[in-house]
């Protein structure tokens, strides 16, 4: 496997003679041969296909020339990655955690499904058991009794559809704690069904009641009770949270991006899931490359002083006073870092405007060329291209401008060539304008717009001083953490407003003109 690795080459600059260069080449070849035996012990990272050619660190550099795409040497190969012992341990731990989460999630679904099936089949069992056990002793079921069968059938159908719509939905997240209201409803349904079964066993099964119409009415009463429980579930799980009661502020810890939301009565863990749902389409994508100051500012270091006392002991006080004076004078010196930052920002904005103008012109020309090809294709059917071929045909004319603009705005890690081609094909297919194509690249879009590998976190951690099953209260603060940043959430209760009414008589709107000697009428 190691022998299959290919290196693009190295460039050497030297002022020595040709013989010394040949000697150095032979020495390098000898060293490379001696390292072949131990090459398997070193980790070599090979860029996977489809990934951007620049990592996060390289995209931050501003000291590269504009022709980096033509002069950069890239090592290509298969998508092989090195894995250390720590990586294997971490992967094993993640697999164990995910297995625990899946088991607990499926356990709740199984319990809920079993309870729902028991509740649905219980009324049917109430009506079938007398027909099976003591059919000969039962009284005849009249017209009213037969009408109850229709009532039970439709009520069970409504209950089945309502339960499926409310409870059997795909879960949006895994909660760290039990959903209190849902668990309360499950306990209530369980107690209700068990109570009905106990009464049915004592008063009907043991005595073998002959009044079949009364048995059917008993089953109808259970179905009615289940319908009322379903109505209670709709109120507690859906309607209770619709009335806004709190205003929450969500701040991203790294760049300070913030949003405000109004929300109703929910537990902390459900609020956390609701915030994550809104985060992915409200917050711009997190780009760590935009957080750094220019290198010219970061490279500046504060001057340091070290004062030595070379005199006698009685001169200690004098040397201490002199050192303090020197340090104070250095501290009073004016720091010009803010000026450098200002000019760096101005230069960056100028470059962005310049690259943006070139990109807009290149895209406009490319789309105009596509329109001209479409008009010609109507006359020459043999030259018709599909959207993919058309996108590949015009991409070369805008690739350089797109590359420079994405690098200047530090968006290149989020847009691969394949994703740009796919978006261009989409725009051509639906007859979208150049502005519609550029909308994705001229500014940072919402997080969910990008590929999942760039924004989707496998797991968020909820950090809260309050129990996560508690409801929101005024002043509650909790944090949603992931590997590279966190969301800090603070809560404020919506104030109570008191309105007073003041009646104004329409007849009271009367005015008098005040005439003065200078007034012109």
From Swiss-Prot:
Belongs to the Vang family. Residues 1-81 are annotated as: Disordered. One of its GO terms (biological process) is negative regulation of canonical Wnt signaling pathway. InterPro entries: VANGL (IPR009539). This is Vang-like protein 2-A. The chain crosses the membrane at residues 109-129, 148-168, 179-199, 219-239. Residues 130-147, 200-218 are extracellular. One of its GO terms (cellular component) is membrane. Residues 1-108, 169-178, 240-521 are cytoplasmic. It comes from the Eukaryota. Residues 69-81 have a biased composition (Low complexity). The gene is vangl2-a. Residues 57-67 have a biased composition (Basic and acidic residues). Residues 15-33 have a biased composition (Basic residues).
């Amino acid at each position: 496997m190691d022998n299959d690795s290919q290196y693009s080459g190295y460039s050497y600059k030297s002022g020595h003679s040709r013989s010394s260069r040949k000697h150095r080449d032979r020495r390098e070849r000898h060293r490379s041969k001696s390292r072949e035996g131990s090459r398997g012990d070193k980790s070599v990272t090979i860029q996977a296909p489809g990934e951007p050619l620049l990592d996060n660190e390289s995209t931050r550099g501003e000291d590269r020339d504009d022709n980096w795409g033509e002069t950069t040497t890239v090592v290509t190969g298969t998508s092989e990655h090195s894995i250390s012992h720590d990586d294997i341990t971490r992967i094993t731990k993640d697999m164990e955690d995910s297995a625990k989460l899946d088991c607990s999630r499926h356990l709740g679904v199984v319990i809920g499904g079993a309870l729902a099936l028991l509740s649905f089949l219980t009324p049917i069992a109430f009506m079938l058991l007398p027909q099976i056990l003591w059919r000969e002793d039962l009284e005849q079921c009249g017209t009213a009794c037969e009408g109850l069968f229709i009532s039970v059938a439709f009520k069970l159908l409504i209950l089945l559809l309502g339960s499926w719509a409310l409870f059997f939905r795909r879960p949006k997240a895994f909660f760290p704690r039990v959903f209190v209201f849902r668990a309360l409803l499950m306990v209530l349904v369980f107690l209700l069904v068990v109570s009905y079964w106990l009464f049915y066993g004592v008063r009907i099964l043991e005595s073998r009641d002959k009044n079949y119409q009364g048995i059917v009415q008993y089953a109808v009463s259970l179905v009615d009770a289940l319908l009322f429980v379903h109505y209670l579930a709709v109120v507690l799980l859906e309607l209770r949270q619709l009335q806004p009661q709190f205003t929450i502020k969500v701040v991203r810890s790294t760049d300070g991006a913030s949003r405000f939301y109004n929300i109703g009565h929910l537990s902390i863990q459900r609020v956390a899931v609701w915030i994550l749902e809104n985060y992915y389409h409200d917050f711009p994508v997190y780009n760590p490359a935009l957080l750094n100051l220019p290198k010219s500012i970061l490279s500046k270091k504060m001057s340091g002083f070290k004062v030595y006392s070379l005199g006698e002991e009685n001169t200690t006080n004098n040397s201490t006073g002199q050192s303090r004076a020197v340090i104070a004078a250095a501290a009073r010196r004016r720091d010009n870092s803010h000026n450098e930052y200002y000019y760096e920002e101005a230069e960056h904005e100028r470059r962005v405007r310049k690259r943006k103008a070139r990109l807009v012109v290149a895209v406009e020309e490319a789309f105009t060329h596509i329109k001209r090809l479409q008009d010609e294709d109507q006359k020459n059917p043999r030259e018709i291209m599909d959207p993919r071929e058309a996108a590949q045909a015009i991409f070369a004319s805008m690739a350089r401008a797109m590359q420079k603009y994405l690098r200047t705005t530090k968006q290149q890690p989020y847009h691969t060539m394949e994703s740009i081609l796919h978006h261009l094909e989409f725009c051509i297919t639906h007859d979208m304008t150049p502005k519609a194509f550029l909308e994705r690249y001229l500014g940072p879009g919402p997080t969910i717009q990008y590929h999942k590998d760039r924004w989707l976190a496998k797991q968020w951690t909820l950090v809260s001083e309050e129990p996560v099953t508690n409801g929101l209260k005024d002043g509650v603060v909790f944090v949603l953490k992931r590997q590279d940043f966190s969301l800090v959430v603070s809560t404020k209760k919506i104030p109570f407003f008191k309105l007073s009414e003041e009646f104004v008589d329409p007849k009271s709107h009367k005015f008098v003109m005040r005439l003065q000697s200078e007034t012109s009428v």
